[in-house]
Regions:
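Transmembrane beta-barrel domains of Gram-negative outer membranes and organellar outer membranes
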Residues: 1-109, 115-203
């Protein structure tokens, strides 16, 4: 985070994911496997610390159409968002609750791609465990409400998963984590199961 003024900071986040995707056809008992580069993203956020417990932030995330095949959305996206942080010092030094929402919108340009228009929500709860270990519930904005074009198998607008992450701080700047998610409500199908290994580096 870059200090701007008293209580104000500018943060940036870049991500270039490698994606392994498996699509299973239970009728033919076959599975298709894809591996490659996913959609790269860049995010800029302005945050304001109100006091020791409360902080708020607004920002925008840009998602580039860099994925091959079906490993990405097939669209450039812009995702403005906001969030509020409340520190839970009673549970631990780095325990906090951060409800956040961003609105994903596709940028016109690809007439063949599906139009994207969906709120993406994350009621993130981070809890410190003994030592360098931590657990986070809903670390990703994976609760989604689809107002864009429908997808195959869609019966409603809501996708609501159970999403959790366990990680370890390797140093003050580096953390390694494993995230797993399974759908609870899949009226708007996004995935059947998601697992991500993340290496986070702070500068």
């Amino acid at each position: 985070m870059i200090p701007l003024d008293v209580g104000w900071r500018l943060g940036a986040h870049a991500q270039v994911p490698l994606v392994q995707k498996t699509t299973t056809n239970f009728e033919t008992e076959s599975a298709d496997h894809e591996f490659g580069l996913g959609d790269a993203s860049f995010q800029a956020v302005v945050a304001h610390a109100i006091n020791d417990r409360w902080a708020a932030a607004v920002g925008t995330r840009l998602v580039a159409q860099t994925a091959a095949g079906s490993l990405g959305s097939g669209e450039w996206q812009v995702q403005p968002g906001l969030g509020v942080r409340y520190m839970l010092f009673e549970l631990g030094e780095d325990c906090y609750f951060v409800p956040s929402m961003r609105y994903a919108m596709s940028i016109p340009g690809n007439a063949q791609a599906r139009r994207i228009s969906e709120p993406q929500i994350a009621p993130t709860l981070n809890i410190d465990l003994p030592g360098p270990v931590f657990i986070t519930f809903y670390p990703s904005n994976d609760i989604r409400i689809n107002y864009g074009a429908p997808v195959a198998g869609q019966t409603g607008r809501l996708f609501f998963p159970f999403d959790a992450l366990i990680g370890v701080r390797l140093s003050d700047q580096v953390a390694l984590s494993l995230e797993g998610s399974v759908p609870i409500v899949k009226a708007y199908p996004v995935y059947n199961f998601k697992a991500e290994v993340k290496l986070r580096m702070l500068f």
